[in-house]
Amino acid sequence: MLVGARVLLGAPRGVGKTFTMLEEAKPLRDEGVDVVVAVVETHGRAGTAAALVGLEVVPRLTVEHRGVVLTEMDVAGVIVRRAPQLALVDELAHTNASRQRTEKRWQDVEAILDAGIDVMSTVNIQHIESLTDVVHKITGAPQRETIPDEVLRAAREIEVIDVTPVAAGALASGLVYPAERIDAALSNYFRLGNLTGLRELALLWLADEVDSALKNYRAEQGIDSTWETRERVVVALTGGPEGDSHPPGATHCRPCGRGELLAVHVTGQDGFAPPTRGLWRQRSLVESLGGSYHQVIGDDIALVEFARAANATQLVIGVSRRGRLARRCPVRGSVDGHRESGNIDVHIVNHAAAGGRFTLPRMAGGALTVKRRLSGLALTLILGPLITAVLVTFRSPDSITSDVLTYQVLVVLVALVGGIWPALLAAVLSGITLDYFLVEPLFTVTVDKPLHLFALALYITIAMMVSYVVDQAARRTRVARRSAAESELLATIAGSVLRGDGALQSLVSRTRKVWVEGCDCWMPRVRPITPTRPPGADGQTAADHAVICADGEPASDDRVVLVPVGERATLELHGADLDASERRLLAVIAAQIDAALEHEALSVTAREVGPLAETDRVRTALLSAVSHDLRRPFDGGNQKGGWLALHRDDPVCRRPGGAARDRRRKPAHLSVLVTDLLDVSRVQAGVLGVTVRQVDVEDVLPRALDELGVGPDQVVLDLDAAVGPVLADPGLLQRVLVNLLANALRFSPEGAVPTIDQSFGDTVQIRVTDHGPGIAADRRDDVFVPFQRLGDTDNSTGLGLGLALSKGFTVGMGGELDTEDTPGGGLTMVVTLPVASADADANADRPGGSRASL
């Protein structure tokens, strides 16, 4: 351990700790202290080298490490040959190149201290073992040389060499790094944010060291009063659902998230109660917030004693879950906690579990609850004897009227509280008691007199009338509460869907809180789940389904309700028994969940389509610009090539090897590519000009064949003379046929001649058939996408625009272009065009605009 050493702790590199160590050593030398420099790294800094002047430096050892000659501190020279009073050792976390004696420099310092020599050393904050990961996150620079915290904390004195981040100007002036490395350092390690973070980290680490020393002093002196030297928050955990809100609430009590967080769970006197799942969850939450978990045995006062022993400044407790009667009584634990806390601030955190959960009033059963009926029965059995005792005490012949009315009040009161059955019991008992104790002859029950029968009938009639009114009022009240609860639930659900973010989880959580113990929303990966085919049926396994979201945990019983959520998911509720009205309400919630799923799907699609649309817009603009800019020089090249071909006999224009012909052909090919690019941009912009008129396919096909240079033996034409003209643009139709026939010729094997035929009905179909390799069914839509070649590596045949343009041209003319399999193998391109009607002459040469898109 570094007992007796003085360590200068710096935050960033170049903060001046080595310079400070050398400057502090000079006054000690002047006072007569024997000081030597055991090892100091100047890193080429002029200021550090100048500070070394006048101090004795122990010569270093020369060692060879992996073929490189290095110098290390001569520990034996310092201890044996020199033996000073104070040795200056730089870079405490340094790893020795030659590990014959020790691996780390701090181990060499321990040896020097054991020899009775005082040591002053330096280290940077990034080399402390517990902080290396944090520094790596801040600066992005990993650290391989470290020193254990316990070794450094054992030092006699640790001083932070602090400097404000604005001192980065020293770096810019060349005091830390040479000029050629300044810009790189300022843009990486020495950014203002990095310097601020490292500075705070160094101060906090030293504050922990000071706090540890303070704890030891308080323990030695027996001080148990609170010293608010550092914010320390103690939070009580119960393991119940209300405890989940305590740790986050406690973090708000720490200024800027600093200070110490201690979570305490108080167990019973025996201490054998096993920890619950909720307590484990809360413990993990506390540890994720940077706190520590503790468990004590005792009662509420033990919590206060722990807080006082930990020198806590604040205590966070929660509101207990209590019934209505308990809410009217003082809470002994909370009151005692307030009284015994002393200088510790006590915070009471509220939570959702304190007020109970939102539930829908059940419509099944009678209008009055069992609790109310039992309350009415209790009133009959308690107030009846009390009233009888009072009336018997003051019994007289003139009090019979008041006696009857008193019992009548009891019957009405019982009817208001408990309904008809307790009221009927109260009426019968009141009549019998009145006749037995208060009507002559006493202590006998005789109901043969009309008056007695009338009184008993009156009691029963009044009880039934009042009970009926109470029952109807209770029924209407229940319906009103149910309607209000449903309205509140639907309003909350609708608001969750409108807010969008987190709507699905909010809906599922709300559903669980209303009805059940667990609520999962399952989405099948293969096929939709229906109530008749739950997960696990028909060979499906859990792997066939993906849980979109869940809330709570499935109940232990087998009660499961499956509700379809549109065609995309199923809502699965565990531990629920629902009546018809609740199922109707659940269907509305399922519709809202379906809307939330659709909203999320649309949001994902929008995020995916947005960049694609922007890319397509830029590409279209680029194609248009390039096409227009390149067309003019290509036209000029074509003209020059044509002139050379025309004057090929001129000796001045002769070129060897048919150069004039090649010179004309290549610009022509490039001109076709530019024209295709321009047409693609027009089709994508929806501004392709189309002139639709009557066109005879037999007139267009020869021109297409001539353009390709195809002879009669290279293609089979199977045209029906009965097929009439079609409505199309002749130029565009020719380009479509040229593109389709060119592809058919290119992909047809040798000896297999492409076929062009046509058929008609309501429309005319032109079929271009080849016997090539064909295209997989799942990739046929891709052939109509611009710049798609589907594995064609022949870059001399074009840019992959032919079929895309053919699709756009055909749709622009009011037709369709589809793909079919060729019997025996291959691909058939089918061009479908409308037949020219009898009145088509009236609309001949009708201009039109393309609505096609790629």
UniProtKB/Swiss-Prot annotation:
Gene3D superfamilies found in the cross-reference section: Backbone structure of the membrane domain of e. Coli histidine kinase receptor kdpd, Histidine kinase-like ATPase, C-terminal domain, P-loop containing nucleotide triphosphate hydrolases
Modified residues (Phosphohistidine): H628
Catalytic activity reported: ATP + protein L-histidine = ADP + protein N-phospho-L-histidine
Regions crossing the membrane: 35-55, 158-178, 374-394, 409-429, 450-470
PROSITE patterns the record matches: HIS_KIN
Superkingdom of source: Bacteria
EC number(s) recorded for this UniProt protein: 2.7.13.3
Membrane topology listed for this record: Multi-pass membrane protein
Cell membrane keyword on record: yes
Domain Histidine kinase, residue spans: 625-837
SUPFAM superfamilies, per database record: ATPase domain of HSP90 chaperone/DNA topoisomerase II/histidine kinase
GO molecular function, one term: phosphorelay sensor kinase activity
CDD domains for the chain: HATPase
A single GO cellular-component term on record: plasma membrane
Keywords: ATP-binding, Cell membrane, Kinase, Membrane, Nucleotide-binding, Phosphoprotein, Transferase, Transmembrane, Transmembrane helix, Two-component regulatory system
Keyword Transmembrane helix appears in the UniProt entry: yes
Cell compartments where the protein resides: Cell membrane
Classification via InterPro entries: HATPase_C_sf (IPR036890), His_kinase_dom (IPR005467), Histidine_kinase_KdpD (IPR052023), KdpD_sf (IPR038318), KdpD_TM (IPR025201), P-loop_NTPase (IPR027417), Sig_transdc_His_kin-like_C (IPR004358), Sig_transdc_His_kinase_KdpD_N (IPR003852)
PANTHER family (alphabetical): SENSOR PROTEIN KDPD (PTHR45569:SF1)
Job of this protein: Member of the two-component regulatory system KdpD/KdpE involved in the regulation of the kdp operon. KdpD may function as a membrane-associated protein kinase that phosphorylates KdpE in response to environmental signals.
This protein's name: Sensor protein KdpD
Source organism of the structure: Rathayibacter rathayi (Corynebacterium rathayi)
Organism lineage: Bacteria, Bacillati, Actinomycetota, Actinomycetes, Micrococcales
GN (gene name): kdpD
